[in-house]
C-alpha cells in the first residue's frame, strides 16, 4: 500500500524533489530493488492476450519468471546493476493489514464464482487479479532464476523496502527501486519508481530525493515519519477526517504525533475519528529502527550467468522458448562482460519537468484558469 497521498503531497510542496528521468540516466548505477513488490506486480500484469496468467502445460504459473527475466535484462541492457531484496517476516503490526488483504482475496474469489455466468470479461479479469497472492514457490523460483543470471539477492529479516533503504544509506547501492513510497519513510536517500515497468508503457523513471522532499515539506526526518503515519501506512489506518493537506498542517504546527493526537482530542471535532487502538509509537519504531541486516556487512557480487542451467530451468522445466531465452542470455553475457565505463554525471540529459505528468497537467489547468481571470 505504501503511504497514502504522499507522492501528490511531495509534488505540491517539494516539486524539485521529484524528477522524471530516462532509464539510461542510471548507466553504471547499482540499485536495490524491492523484489516482493516486483513479484506481485508481475503476477498481476504479465498476462496472455486472453488475460490469463502465463502457465506451463501442467498449469504452473510462469508470469513472475518472465517478468523478472526480461525486466532484469532490460536494466542490464542500460548498464544498470540491479540486485533484489525479498521480504522476510512481517512486523506484528502488519498482520492486521495482511488479514484484510486475505479477506479481500476471498471476497473476490466468491464474487468470481457468483458472477462467472453473467459478468463480462473485463469484470472477471479484475476479480481474477484481485485474487493474486505470491507464494513461497514463486519466491523460491525467482531467487533460483536470479542466481542463475548471476544477480545478487538478499532476504531481508523483515520488510524488503527497509533493507533496500539500508543498502542505499550504506552506499552499497545508488538508490532503492520500489513503487512503495514508504521506502522513503525507511530513509532511502534516493527512491526510483517505475524502474521495472514494462518498456511498452514508456513510463519515465520517477526519481524522488529524500533530502529535497524534507526541505520542501519544511520538516525533519522524525516529523516526516510522523507525517507518513498520519497519512496512513502499512501498519496503521489513517485517522478518518484527516486528509493529506490537513495532516501536513497538523505536523507543521504541532511537530509530533503525540501533540497532534492531544490537539485532536481537545478539539473534539465529530468529523475526526481517532481509533480506540492506534499504536502510532509502534509504527514509528518500525520506521526509525527497522529490522535489517547492516548494509556494510553485506557483500554484493554480480557473477557470470549459468546459461545452460538457465535454459534447462526456463525452457525444459517451464516451457519458455529456447531461442528467445538463449538470445536473452547472449545479451546478458555481453552486457556483463563489457568493461564498466565510468559515469560522467550530466552526460545524459534529464527529461524536462520535475513533477509527475498528472501534477503538471493539474498545474496547467490552474494556469489557464488564472489567465482567464486577468
Swiss-Prot record:
Q: Which SUPFAM superfamilies match?
A: 5' to 3' exonuclease, C-terminal subdomain (SSF47807), PIN domain-like (SSF88723)
Chain intervals for the UniProt region annotation (Disordered): 103-122, 335-374
Q: How is the cofactor bound?
A: Binds 2 magnesium ions per subunit. They probably participate in the reaction catalyzed by the enzyme. May bind an additional third magnesium ion after substrate binding.
Keywords of the record, alphabetical order, are: DNA damage, DNA repair, DNA replication, Endonuclease, Exonuclease, Hydrolase, Magnesium, Metal-binding, Mitochondrion, Nuclease, Nucleus, Phosphoprotein
The GO terms describing molecular function are: 5'-3' exonuclease activity; 5'-flap endonuclease activity; DNA binding; magnesium ion binding
The UniProt entry, under CDD domains, shows:
H3TH_FEN1-Euk, PIN_FEN1
- The residues that the entry says bind Mg(2+) 2 are 180, 182, 234
Q: Which cofactor does it need?
A: Mg(2+)
**Positions of the region N-domain?**
1-105
Q: Which InterPro entries match?
A: 5-3_exonuclease_C_sf, Flap_endonuc, HhH2, PIN-like_dom_sf, XPG-I_dom, XPG/Rad2, XPG_CS, XPG_DNA_repair_N
Domain of life of the native organism = Eukaryota
Please name the GO terms of the biological process aspect recorded for this protein, alphabetically. Answer: base-excision repair; DNA replication, removal of RNA primer; double-strand break repair via nonhomologous end joining; gene conversion at mating-type locus; maintenance of DNA trinucleotide repeats
Q: Which residues bind Mg(2+) 1?
A: 34, 87, 159, 161
UniProt subcellular location: Nucleus, Nucleolus; Nucleus, Nucleoplasm; Mitochondrion
Post-translational modifications: Phosphorylated. Phosphorylation upon DNA damage induces relocalization to the nuclear plasma.
Subunit text:
Interacts with PCNA. Three molecules of FEN1 bind to one PCNA trimer with each molecule binding to one PCNA monomer. PCNA stimulates the nuclease activity without altering cleavage specificity.
Q: What does this protein do?
A: Structure-specific nuclease with 5'-flap endonuclease and 5'-3' exonuclease activities involved in DNA replication and repair. During DNA replication, cleaves the 5'-overhanging flap structure that is generated by displacement synthesis when DNA polymerase encounters the 5'-end of a downstream Okazaki fragment. It enters the flap from the 5'-end and then tracks to cleave the flap base, leaving a nick for ligation. Also involved in the long patch base excision repair (LP-BER) pathway, by cleaving within the apurinic/apyrimidinic (AP) site-terminated flap.
Q: What is this protein called?
A: Flap endonuclease 1
Species this protein is from: Mycosarcoma maydis (Corn smut fungus)
Q: What is the lineage of its organism?
A: Eukaryota, Fungi, Dikarya, Basidiomycota, Ustilaginomycotina
- The UniProt gene name for this protein comes to FEN1
Amino acid at each position: 500500500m505504501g503511504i497514502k497521498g504522499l507522492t501528490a503531497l511531495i509534488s505540491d510542496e517539494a516539486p524539485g524533489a521529484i524528477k522524471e528521468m530516462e532509464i539510461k540516466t542510471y548507466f553504471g548505477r547499482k540499485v536495490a530493488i524491492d523484489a516482493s513488490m516486483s513479484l506481485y506486480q508481475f503476477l498481476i500484469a504479465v498476462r496472455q492476450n486472453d488475460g490469463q496468467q502465463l502457465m506451463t502445460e501442467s498449469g504452473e504459473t510462469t508470469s513472475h519468471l518472465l517478468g523478472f527475466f526480461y525486466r532484469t535484462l532490460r536494466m542490464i541492457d542500460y548498464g544498470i546493476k540491479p540486485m533484489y531484496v525479498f521480504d522476510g517476516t512481517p512486523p506484528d503490526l502488519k498482520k492486521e493489514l495482511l488479514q484484510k488483504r486475505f479477506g479481500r482475496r476471498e471476497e473476490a474469489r466468491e464474487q468470481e464464482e457468483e458472477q462467472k455466468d453473467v459478468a463480462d470479461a473485463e469484470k472477471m479479469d479484475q476479480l481474477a487479479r484481485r485474487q493474486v497472492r505470491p507464494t513461497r514457490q514463486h519466491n523460491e523460483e525467482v531467487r533460483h532464476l536470479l542466481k542463475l543470471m548471476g544477480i545478487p539477492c538478499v532476504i531481508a529479516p523483515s520488510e524488503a523496502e527497509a533493507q533496500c533503504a539500508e543498502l542505499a544509506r550504506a552506499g552499497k547501492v545508488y538508490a532503492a527501486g520500489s513503487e512503495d513510497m514508504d521506502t522513503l519513510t525507511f530513509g532511502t536517500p534516493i527512491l526510483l519508481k517505475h524502474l521495472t515497468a514494462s518498456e511498452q508503457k514508456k513510463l519515465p523513471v520517477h526519481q524522488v530525493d529524500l533530502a529535497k522532499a524534507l526541505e520542501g515539506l519544511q520538516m525533519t526526518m522524525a516529523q516526516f515519519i510522523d507525517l507518513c503515519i498520519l497519512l496512513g501506512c502499512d501498519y496503521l489506518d489513517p485517522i478518518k477526517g484527516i486528509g493529506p493537506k490537513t495532516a501536513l498542517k497538523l505536523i507543521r504546527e504541532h511537530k509530533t504525533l503525540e501533540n497532534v493526537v492531544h490537539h485532536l482530542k481537545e478539539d473534539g471535532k465529530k468529523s475526526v475519528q481517532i481509533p480506540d487502538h492506534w499504536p502510532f509509537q509502534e509504527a514509528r519504531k518500525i520506521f526509525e529502527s527497522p529490522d535489517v541486516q547492516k548494509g556494510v556487512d553485506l557483500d554484493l557480487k554480480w557473477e557470470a550467468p549459468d546459461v545452460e542451467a538457465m535454459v534447462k530451468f526456463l525452457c525444459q522445466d517451464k516451457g519458455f522458448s529456447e531461442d528467445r531465452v538463449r538470445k536473452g542470455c547472449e545479451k546478458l553475457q555481453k552486457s556483463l562482460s563489457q568493461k564498466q565505463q565510468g559515469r560522467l554525471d550530466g552526460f545524459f540529459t534529464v527529461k524536462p519537468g520535475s513533477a509527475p505528468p498528472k501534477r503538471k497537467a493539474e498545474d496547467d489547468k490552474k494556469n489557464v484558469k488564472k489567465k482567464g481571470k486577468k
